[in-house]
């Protein structure tokens, strides 16, 4: 791979890693490059983000990991996006992610990934943007991953007074919700959203 291709791979990996970020050790293993090469690529990508007005991202180093973030100059537009009401029905991936967070909170994105068996960065961003989920602190130790919890808006959207009102788990040993109860639960949520749109 030439340098430009390496930068493209690096950017893809950082995007996929989301809030968890990537360490130089992870980059050297995945990209099969040296530690120095990883640092050089990170520095070059950071310079490109910082020097170009048409790029909306920056590269941050937090607690030994690197992650992409939006530029502060665009904060006003991002705030507007979050504030724009959205009555769209949640996707199956978002509903599954929301159920995992609701039952296991506080929980990290990586823990949600393990339960679902796929990356959940996109669904979590959607849930945060819709105000159903928020981050509440970080895990102690390496990586300092964000901990996600549901919000009061989540309770309102699902007609719950508290988390105690969630459908009961069929088998506490597995921590998996009863599928029939969950289907009824999410159907009720989707119906309420459809009624709001009418």
UniProtKB/Swiss-Prot annotation:
The keyword Transport belongs to this UniProt entry's keyword annotation: no
Record region (Disordered):
168-198
A GO term from the CC aspect: cytoplasm
Q: Which Gene3D superfamilies match?
A: Winged helix-like DNA-binding domain superfamily/Winged helix DNA-binding domain
Q: Does the keyword Lyase apply?
A: no
Q: Where in the cell is it found?
A: Cytoplasm
> What Pfam families has UniProt attached to this entry?
SMC_ScpB
Q: Any stretches that span the bilayer, and where are they? A: none
Any one Gene Ontology biological process term?
DNA replication
Q: Which UniProt keywords apply?
A: Cell cycle, Cell division, Chromosome partition, Cytoplasm
Q: Which family does it belong to?
A: Belongs to the ScpB family.
Task: Summarize subunit and interaction data from the UniProt record for this chain.
Answer: Homodimer. Homodimerization may be required to stabilize the binding of ScpA to the Smc head domains. Component of a cohesin-like complex composed of ScpA, ScpB and the Smc homodimer, in which ScpA and ScpB bind to the head domain of Smc. The presence of the three proteins is required for the association of the complex with DNA.
Q: What does this protein do?
A: Participates in chromosomal partition during cell division. May act via the formation of a condensin-like complex containing Smc and ScpA that pull DNA away from mid-cell into both cell halves.
Please identify the protein, giving its name as recorded. Segregation and condensation protein B
Organism (species): Listeria monocytogenes serovar 1/2a (strain ATCC BAA-679 / EGD-e)
Q: Taxonomically, what lineage is the organism? A: Bacteria, Bacillati, Bacillota, Bacilli, Bacillales
């Amino acid at each position: 791979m030439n340098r430009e291709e390496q930068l493209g791979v690096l950017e893809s990996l950082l995007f996929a890693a989301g809030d968890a970020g990537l360490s130089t050790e992870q980059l050297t293993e995945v990209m099969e490059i040296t530690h120095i090469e990883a640092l050089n690529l990170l520095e070059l990508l950071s310079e490109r983000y910082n020097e170009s007005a048409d790029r909306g991202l920056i590269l941050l180093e937090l607690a030994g990991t690197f992650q992409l973030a939006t530029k502060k100059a665009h904060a006003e537009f991002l705030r507007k996006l979050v504030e724009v009401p959205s009555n769209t029905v949640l996707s199956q991936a978002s509903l599954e992610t929301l159920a995992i967070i609701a039952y296991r909170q506080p929980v990290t994105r990586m823990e949600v990934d393990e339960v679902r068996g796929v990356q959940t960065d996109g669904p979590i961003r959607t849930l945060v943007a819709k105000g159903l989920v928020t981050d509440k602190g970080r895990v102690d130790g390496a990586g300092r991953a964000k901990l996600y919890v549901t919000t009061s808006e989540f309770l309102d959207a699902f007609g719950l007074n508290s988390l105690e009102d969630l459908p009961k788990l069929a088998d506490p040993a597995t921590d998996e919700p009863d599928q029939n109860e969950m289907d009824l639960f999410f159907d009720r949520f989707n119906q309420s959203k459809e009624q709001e749109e009418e």
